[in-house]
A protein has these predicted regions:
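Short alpha-helical donor nucleotide-sugar binding micro-motif in glycosyltransferases
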Residues: 138, 253-254, 261-266
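Nucleotide-activated donor-binding/catalytic signature segment of Leloir-type glycosyltransferases, i.e.
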Residues: 234-254
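N-terminal strand-loop element at the rim of the active site
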Residues: 2, 7-71
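Short hydrophobic beta-strand element within catalytic cores of glycosyltransferases
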Residues: 289, 293-298
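Conserved acidic donor-binding segment of nucleotide-sugar-dependent glycosyltransferases
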Residues: 309-322, 331-337
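Short His-centered aromatic/hydrophobic patch
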Residues: 92-99
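Conserved donor-binding/catalytic core segment of Leloir-type glycosyltransferases
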Residues: 6, 184-215, 224
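Donor nucleotide-sugar binding/catalytic pocket of nucleotide-sugar-dependent glycosyltransferases
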Residues: 40, 134-180
Length: 373
């Protein structure tokens, strides 16, 4: 079956989880010989069309403004209207009001899949403005895919349409850390157990609780936080306030070429997120692929604690409680038997559920089933 698909949604260049998923879908499908293009609003001045391979194009439209994490790109509307009829399936990635508006105005008559990455949690005012458009999108969708069974069953806007809801776990390529880079990182913290976290420095990540947990850890632990964002200054001030300059390190943006090395260098990966905005957390899957035990949070309605199976790939704790973070980290790190159990459990869970191949296989099955209906 010759399938033609368009991934529609979040902006380029790739920084966050949704963009990573769109790009992984585009590459994974195209490398299987399926025609798959990606249309998105550009977050910089790089616009136009780029040929990724024989079966995939990246199409970036000009952004005029950014409002409540939404790219305002009128050009996306005209571009989509011009190309939409070339595709059997449009796979739109939610939440993205701009992409939803473009689809609404496109006149597209083919199959639509909505990938429900997250509810709109923080931007309550935005939600009220776009709710009629979102209700249309839910009605228009032939299939709604979530990233975990927990999230889509709990999403308020999907309660009445569960018959057309399914889930597909996000998979990632197995990380292969460069041994020399791993050694270089570990040599910067000699004799220390390394707790690593990576993500945007924003409120829902709960990094302030991870920093507070450092005060409860012995001196042979260090906490490394990779990523950039608006709360960087506030978090650095916390580190100074609590005199943790030798124990907590805000690393800033981690280049892609050294991402794997930090996973390989750490002893434990910690996800301290506190809000349902954190629906899945691809970073913990990436850490699992390196055999790293996970400490994550039990956020009601989120898939985070489903990804990290408690007692198998690591431990899940109450959000916003630094004492529980410190306790879980030590439970994993202080007993070699426990550490090995969770390390092997993380690797096993990755290979069973979260490989790039498994995700691509699942996606193709959904596409074929939809087109056969």
């Amino acid at each position: 079956m010759n399938i033609r698909v368009l991934q529609l949604g979040k902006f380029h260049p790739i920084k966050g989880g949704v963009e990573k998923v769109m790009y992984a879908f585009t590459l994974g499908l195209s490398l299987r010989g399926i025609s798959c293009d990606m249309l998105c609003a550009s977050d910089d001045d790089d616009v136009g069309e780029t040929r990724l391979n024989a079966h995939a194009r990246l199409i970036k439209t000009k952004t005029l403004a950014k409002l409540a994490a939404t790219m305002i790109s009128p050009e996306m509307i005209s571009v989509l209207r011009g190309i939409c009829h070339d595709y059997d399936i449009i796979h739109i990635h939610y939440p993205d009001p701009m992409a939803t508006l473009a689809l609404f105005l496109s006149g597209y008559k083919g199959k639509v899949i909505v990938h429900w990455h997250s509810d709109i949690v923080k931007q309550k005012i935005l939600l009220q403005f776009v709710k009629p458009l979102l209700n249309w999108l839910i009605r228009r969708a032939d299939l709604i895919l979530g990233t975990s069974p927990v999230y889509v069953s709990d999403a308020p806007m999907l309660k009445s349409v569960q018959a057309k809801v399914d889930y597909l776990p996000i998979g990632v390529r197995e990380r292969a850390p460069d041994a020399s880079l791993v050694a270089m990182i570990r040599n910067q913290y000699p004799g220390k157990k390394i707790v690593y976290s990576m993500g945007r420095l924003v409120a829902y990540k709960g990094y302030e609780y991870l920093i507070e947990a450092a005060m409860m850890l012995p001196d042979d632990y260090v906490i490394l936080i990779g990523g950039s964002g608006p709360l960087k200054g506030k978090l650095q001030s916390m580190v100074r306030k609590y005199q943790l300059q030798q124990k907590v390190f805000i690393l800033g943006f981690i280049p892609r070429e050294v991402e794997s090395a930090y996973y390989g260098a750490c002893d434990v990966f910690c996800l301290s997120s506190v809000m349902k905005t954190e629906a899945y957390a691809i970073v913990q899957v990436e850490a699992m692929s390196c055999g790293r035990p996970i400490v994550a949070t039990r956020i009601p309605g989120s898939g985070v604690s489903w990804v990290n199976e408690h007692g198998i790939s690591g431990l899940n704790i109450t959000p916003g409680v630094p004492e529980e973070i410190a306790d879980a980290v030590q439970k994993i790190c202080e007993d070699p038997y426990v550490y090995e159990k969770y390390s092997m459990g993380a690797l096993y869970r990755y290979h069973r559920l979260f490989t790039l191949e498994a995700m691509t296989d699942g996606l193709i099955k959904h596409y074929k089933k939809l087109l056969e209906e």
